Design a protein with these regions (language model features):
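Bacterial N-terminal signal peptides that target proteins for export
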Residues: 3-17
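C-terminal motif of bacterial Sec signal peptides marking the signal peptidase cleavage site
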Residues: 25-28
Length: 169
């Protein structure tokens, strides 16, 4: 009888242990950092300078990538940025929580047109919201848009827009 009790208890303990291992594995997979997406170059056609300006961007497509953004980045070189890609047009809202570098943000509609540009201050919890429904947001080091001659009304190149649409799928 005692042996039967021990055997039954071992089966129960084994089942509980297996369950806990599965839960731990699931949690570790969920919390694991995804590998960074490959940077890509987008082209912006500037009306004022009549040139095409390349910007090397990190795409932020998933909710986790978008939430992290440029948090805790101390340097963002000119000519680089992060493009936030959404599946549908919407009014977007950004803040600078845990972001030590001043940024400028361009809100871009589904046709690739830059609708508006704003500056954002380090660590600010103030919300920067798009006035229009847009599909993309491009963050760069503060002042870069002005230095490069990029303004509201400029457009992404057709090729850049097609590549962004493809990664949104």
């Amino acid at each position: 009888m005692y042996f039967y009790f021990i055997q039954k208890r071992l089966k129960h303990t084994s089942a509980v242990l297996c369950f806990l291992i599965l839960v731990a594995a699931a949690v570790s997979c969920t919390n694991a950092e995804r590998p960074k997406r490959e940077p890509m170059t987008i082209l912006i056609e500037s009306k004022s300078t009549k040139t095409t300006i390349p910007i090397e961007v990190e795409p932020a497509v998933t909710a986790q990538e978008q939430e992290r953004g440029f948090m805790n980045r101390k340097e963002i070189p000119d000519g680089t940025g992060m493009i936030f890609v959404f599946k549908r047009d919407q009014k977007l809202r950004f803040w600078m929580k845990d972001t030590p570098h001043p940024l400028s943000i361009a809100f871009i509609d589904s046709t690739g047109r830059i609708r508006e540009i704003y500056d954002m201050q380090p660590f600010s919890l103030d919300i920067i919201a798009s006035t229009y429904s847009v599909r993309y947001a491009l963050e760069v080091a503060q002042g870069y848009f002005e230095r490069a001659g990029i303004n509201a009304g400029n457009k992404l190149s057709t090729e850049s827009l097609e590549r962004l649409k493809a990664i949104a799928q």
